[in-house]
């Protein structure tokens, strides 16, 4: 029998133990009763950061800014990826302007920047906007079935 996955709620930051076999069944948070695995990216804030990157499912973070043209053109690609990767990888967005206290320590040098976290650690980073097939290939190269 496989161990349940520990997945932080994107709404209240509460930790949830979800049986791996039930990941595709739209599990709800035990604390706030909202869906834990979203088919769209969620907004990451400083207060949530440490807890959110530690979940058992990988977290792909898109660091962006309102004024950034490539960020805006990449947003629909990231949204589509979120809908296709439910249960495989969680996708979050970090507005680098509104969250400078977090973007700074992450060492963001250009945007958009993607940072992939597994088990609380950064495992990969990629800058720039690219099409969905290239994003999925990049994720597969880091062990995520996309």
Cite the ranges covered by each PLM segment.
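Thiol-based oxidoreductase modules, predominantly thioredoxin-like and allied folds used
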Residues: 63, 78-82, 86-101
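Short linker/helix segments within small regulatory modules
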Residues: 18-27
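Short cysteine-rich clusters marking metal-coordination/redox-active sites
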Residues: 9-12, 29-32
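Cys/His-rich microdomains that often coordinate metals
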Residues: 16, 36, 75
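Short pre-active-site segment immediately N-terminal to redox-active cysteine/selenocysteine motifs
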Residues: 57, 64-67, 110
């Amino acid at each position: 029998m496989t161990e349940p996955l520990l997945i932080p709620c994107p709404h209240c930051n509460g930790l949830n133990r979800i049986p791996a076999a039930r990941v595709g069944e739209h599990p709800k948070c035990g604390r706030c009763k909202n869906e834990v695995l979203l088919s769209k990216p969620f907004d990451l804030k400083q207060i949530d950061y440490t807890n959110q990157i530690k979940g058992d499912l990988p977290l792909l973070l898109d660091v962006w800014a309102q004024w950034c043209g490539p960020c805006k053109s990449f947003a629909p690609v990231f949204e589509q990826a979120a809908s296709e990767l439910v249960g495989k990888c969680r996708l979050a967005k970090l507005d680098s302007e509104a969250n400078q206290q977090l973007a700074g320590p992450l060492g963001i040098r250009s945007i958009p920047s993607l940072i992939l976290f597994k088990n609380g650690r950064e495992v990969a980073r990629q800058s720039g906007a690219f099409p969905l097939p290239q994003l999925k290939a990049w994720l597969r190269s880091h062990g995520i079935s996309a």
